Amino acid sequence: MNRRIIFISALFISLFVSTNVWGQTFDPWVYENPERVIYAIEKSWSKTPLKVGNDFPKAMIRNFAKSFCSQYQKYAPNVAMTLYLKKPGQNKVEDDNYYMEDDPRNGYIKCNMPGQFDYLTEMCYWKRANGHSLVGVLLQMGHEGEGVDDDSALLFYDFDPSTRTMTPDMKVYQTVKDILAKHVGTPTFNLPKEGKDIRVHYIEFIQTDENDFKWEQNTLKWENDTFTEIEGETGLY
């Protein structure tokens, strides 16, 4: 049985189980090839400002997540997070297929769908000097056991509380893209659960007698309303 068939079968099972958790009927074929969905979102997101509701007055990260995830419903973690946010105090945060991290106090939320095709939606936000917020959205998919074969999109929005609108922040987005372009390795990210900085893990395939991959762990430091890269550890494995 090839990998494509295995993936579709596993995804069908996971979505069926999730139907029992969140009371929603899924069409598993919609979520085929999630890496293509990530690519499609990154190609189009800059054209679409998002209105933000106020369903959670004391948990802005939930409002941001609901706004973004409801806009992009062809990506399974977004669907799961949208359904979770209908009743976040009552819905399960974990089953065999989805794991939610919901931390309103620290302004952080994540929905992860583990397995061979481990993929997630992760969000947080930073306060800006002008009273706005910078909202970070990470869509990431990693093929377990396949080294550098990862797909991700790291997007940024400026939230204006006076208009309750999330506008794509292309300046910050391009700053981060320019930093990443200096590296050969494939990046994966961890948005901050606490603190302000983003962790970036680069993995580069190399051909040697003893090692196949080179890794580099750096930090995108948030200060003065922008990100700068701080170099960290490197190694081989």
Predicted segments, located by residue:
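Terminal domain-start segments
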Residues: 23-127
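Short, surface-exposed coil-to-beta transition loops
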Residues: 118-121, 135-138, 148-154, 183-185, ...
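Cleavable N-terminal signal peptides
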Residues: 10-11, 21
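Mid-length scaffold segments of soluble, non-membrane domains
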Residues: 134-169
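Bacterial N-terminal signal peptides that target proteins for export
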Residues: 1-8
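Short aromatic loop motif centered on NTY/YTY
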Residues: 165-237
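Acidic/hydrophobic-patterned starts of short beta strands in beta-sheet-rich repeat architectures
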Residues: 132-141, 194-200
